[in-house]
């Protein structure tokens, strides 16, 4: 198939590379000149496992172009993965998406049969509302037998994007018509490593499924964390014994039923807030998603208070793990950063070491913390250590903690 990918960021580039490795002729476009030139030269900065090897093997099948009209020319489907940032209300902004849709629509040839596939996460009602309107206005044609519209969000995590795309639990496809959904299902089917169930439905159903899935996961995390809080206050309870037993019930299961740090990252928090905002728009309470948010926010404060009760007020505290998960340097709404900020607000000096090499993003204040380059340097500086997420080499950290005899709190109980 002849395909295009618009937006070559952390998700778009892996998808483009996978489609190109799946036997398709793929054209990729990003509005940033530096991104395009870096990909052309295969000289990109990434720690996404498997991405560079894919790029090196797709020199003949992945073409980077300099404008959207060149990307759209002659393709059967275009995948759009541009940012849909969260607004203060919790809703997603469609500004960048609608701009891309307009340019794509204006570039479609008179007799070209094409499917426009929105991969970016959007609010329910977006595809049948402003996105459809913008596309039909730009093309001068109704969505139907010649132009199809699909919504196909990815369920992935940074640090395992390639693996998550190759081994998904399902392909979720919202479709304007059967033929449009078939085109997208066929393209996605070429990149998976095992048979995957596809669920094709109308556009609004798929939009709701995307944020509902992530809301269920965050609800499960907050449920486990609320149990942890109660267990600590009750005393004499091993929370892992409790959640292990609960997870054996087939109606519940063990996945994400782990009491640890608060949830974070670029997807979980914003999808949870979006469902709350949606329910408020509908005149419903949205109490479950709102409660999930509130438990998550209170959990970091609860953990900080437990640390406060265990150390001297003049103690220096080290935080190991700044990125929101193992395998990435992204710190967006990371639990480690949240704990560090909370401890600073309580008056503690905070030193940070991250085994992924993460630093504070552009939206954070790095001057509040002391960054160190190794575990040994951290342990030499602090009186108490907090481990905020799973580590790449927990046994090494465990040995260093034993040797230093430093007290610590491992939120994930890795050793």
Residue ranges and their predicted role:
Residues 1-415:
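Structural/interface elements that position substrates and couple domains in central-metabolism enzymes
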């Amino acid at each position: 198939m002849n395909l295009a990918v618009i937006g070559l960021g952390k998700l778009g580039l892996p998808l483009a590379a996978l489609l190109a490795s799946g036997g398709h002729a793929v054209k990729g476009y990003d509005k940033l000149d530096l991104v395009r030139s870096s990909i052309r030269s295969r000289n990109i900065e990434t720690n996404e496992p498997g991405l560079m090897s894919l790029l090196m093997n797709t020199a003949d099948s992945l073409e980077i172009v300099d404008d959207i009209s060149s990307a759209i020319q002659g393709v059967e489907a275009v995948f759009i993965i541009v940012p849909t940032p969260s607004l203060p209300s919790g809703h997603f902004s469609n500004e960048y998406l609608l701009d891309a849709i307009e340019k794509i629509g204006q570039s479609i040839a008179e007799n070209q049969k094409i499917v426009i596939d929105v991969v970016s996460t959007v609010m329910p009602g977006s595809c049948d509302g402003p996105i459809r309107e913008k596309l039909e206005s730009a093309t001068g044609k109704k969505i139907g037998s010649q132009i199809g519209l699909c919504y196909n969000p990815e369920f992935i995590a940074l640090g395992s994007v390639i693996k998550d795309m190759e081994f998904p639990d399902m392909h979720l496809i919202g479709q304007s018509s059967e033929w449009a959904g078939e085109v997208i299902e066929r393209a996605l089917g070429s990149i998976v490593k095992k048979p995957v169930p596809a669920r094709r439905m109308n556009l609004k159903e798929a939009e709701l499924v995307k944020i509902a899935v992530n809301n269920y996961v965050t609800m499960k995390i907050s449920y486990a964390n609320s149990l942890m809080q109660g267990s600590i206050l009750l005393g004499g309870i091993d929370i892992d014994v409790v959640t292990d037993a609960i997870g054996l019930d087939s109606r519940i299961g063990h996945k994400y039923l782990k009491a640890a740090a608060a949830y974070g990252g670029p997807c979980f928090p914003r999808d949870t807030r979006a469902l709350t905002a949606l329910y408020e728009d509908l005149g419903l309470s949205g109490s479950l998603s709102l409660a999930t948010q509130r438990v998550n926010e209170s959990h970091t404060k609860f953990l900080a208070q437990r640390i406060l009760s265990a150390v001297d007020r003049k103690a220096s505290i080290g935080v190991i793990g700044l990125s929101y998960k193992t395998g990435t340097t992204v710190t967006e709404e990371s639990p480690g950063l949240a704990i560090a900020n909370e401890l600073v607000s309580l008056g503690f000096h905070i030193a940070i070491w991250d085994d992924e090499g993460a630093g504070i993003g552009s939206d954070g204040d790095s001057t509040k913390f002391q960054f160190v380059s190794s575990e040994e340097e951290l342990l030499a500086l602090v009186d108490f250590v907090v481990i905020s997420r799973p580590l790449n080499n927990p046994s090494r950290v465990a040995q260093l903690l034993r040797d230093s005899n430093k007290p610590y709190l491992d939120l994930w109980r890795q050793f």
